[in-house]
């Protein structure tokens, strides 16, 4: 359950989409995609955006390409030895203690084979744009009368014209070979060879306005993607096909997770969060949350989930119990969070990365 948990920094999405890589590169004559990560004196205090568990190790990523590692449950941190980019990293996923991937601004995809100690660049926005263009051109060739194929081809041409300026916002690998990434403007790519090559899957999504895709999760043959304007895309055949499902909220959905009992939980703007027990066919609102955007959902063993918001508040939702605000030390606005094996919380944001004790067993409040 805990091996590959990761979060992405939805609190920073507005910034992510307004301060894309050209802005980051303006401060230096060397592009951020080619400049190594900032070496920080206290790297764990840099703006951190996402984290994952890699076996017993914790790996967190953040702005300027900073990656930090902890081998004592988040009590102490050290910086990764080599990261080839200084662009902001937004999400990270591990499949076991050695193999992991991170994504970020400029469409960058990084890979580690040594538990996060060193990283290599597998792709960037230009490589992904070329892959999208190839896929769209092939679809247009096969279906010359398809309006959708023609639209996809035009969108792919725009990606190439714009260059590597689109952020990736989430990544999930299910094993050493198979992974998916999503991002702004309907970016959706898949790999079957551990990230060596990527194929666009955007034409499988009903997203004609190219709205942003914020988060992706999968379990078995089911894949879920949430995004801007209440988007929810679901696949029941391992990602071969997707259908757009209606959701009760038409604002942005920033996060989702799959609870151990099979429930799907989605959350987003203004404290809106919903739970489904039937794979997204119907939804029940998680009531009593303040009108502050949820930025992270983290599921745990008994069907419960933790929800974190922009105010630095953490809530517990369990089936059959009322939503409960957990008593935690004052936190900075959260960019992401990860529930640890000992049921402590790893909180990430403008204050860096901190370990927060929780008392989940004392937080039950029957409805």
Predicted regions and their residues:
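Residue-level hotspots at or immediately adjacent to binding/recognition sites across diverse folds
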Residues: 25-367
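Compositionally biased, low-complexity segments
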Residues: 14-17, 142
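Bacterial N-terminal signal peptides that target proteins for export
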Residues: 2-13
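N-terminal signal peptide c-region/cleavage motif recognized by signal peptidases
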Residues: 21-23
